[in-house]
Design a protein with these regions (language model features):
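Domain-level signal for soluble alpha/beta catalytic cores
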Residues: 1-231
Length: 231
């Protein structure tokens, strides 16, 4: 929901959105209704595990955030709260057996990206207060920052560490990945940590710059590491 809101209310889009809505609040009310109706529909069809891909937080942590949103730091903090509120408004009163996860992405088009930045500036909003069961997080390079922000992950929420990049065919060093998992475990208990690729291998029509064989080698590595770390 936050990414939908972002795309229709960022400076380049807001004027056009307000041609159809009297206010942003009216737009947000419709947005919540739409998402709730969709979730109800797919739940009735059998969905019990819902993942929300959310690039909005990636733009907020980027050093160019004030430029993207045409605001200052106080304005960015207000936007973080707004995005948290819209997500949680959608994620209230859901069926107890529906698992909701979120993937925070910084862009994954043809082995390029849209944003950079550690999670620190959004952690107290996203990790502490968003009503999801698990976070799928990119941690495949220095653009993602360190693991310190994971200390904000509240309750028994799970964290899926995206330590295996999908942007390059180069295979990661197994022992280095295992070491990073144990580093993350300083902030979130190991039994609440998981491992995955950083994002999709073909998030868009134009796939990333690696071969199918390299893709499968990376997935095999994920499996091997998971078996070694968690048994």
């Amino acid at each position: 929901p936050a990414q939908f809101l972002e795309q229709f209310t960022m400076p380049f889009a807001l004027e056009n959105t307000l041609k159809y809505y009297a206010s942003v609040e009216d737009f947000k009310a419709d947005l919540v209704k739409m998402y709730k109706a969709f979730i109800e529909e797919i739940y009735a069809a059998g969905c019990r595990n819902l993942q929300l891909d959310d690039c909005s937080w990636g733009l907020l942590v980027d050093p160019r955030g004030p430029e993207f949103f045409n605001t200052d730091q106080a304005g960015l903090d207000a936007i973080k709260q707004e995005y948290l509120d819209i997500n949680n408004a959608v994620l209230t009163d859901l069926p107890e057996d529906l698992i909701v996860n979120t993937h925070v992405c910084r862009g994954n088009f043809h082995s390029t990206y849209a944003a950079s930045g550690a999670y620190d500036d959004v952690a107290s909003f996203l990790f502490e207060k968003e009503n999801v069961h698990a976070y799928f997080l990119e941690f495949d390079d220095s653009r993602s920052g360190g693991f310190e922000s994971l200390k904000y992950v509240s309750g028994d929420k799970k964290v899926v560490l995206g330590l295996i990049t999908t942007k390059s065919g180069e295979l990661e060093d197994k022992e280095a990945v295992i070491a990073r998992i144990h580093e993350a475990a300083k902030y979130v208990l190991l039994d609440r940590l998981y491992l995955s690729p950083q994002c999709g291998f073909a998030s868009c029509e134009i796939e990333n710059k690696l071969t199918e064989e390299q893709q499968w080698a990376k997935l095999k590595l994920v499996k091997e590491i998971a078996e070694e770390v968690w048994g």
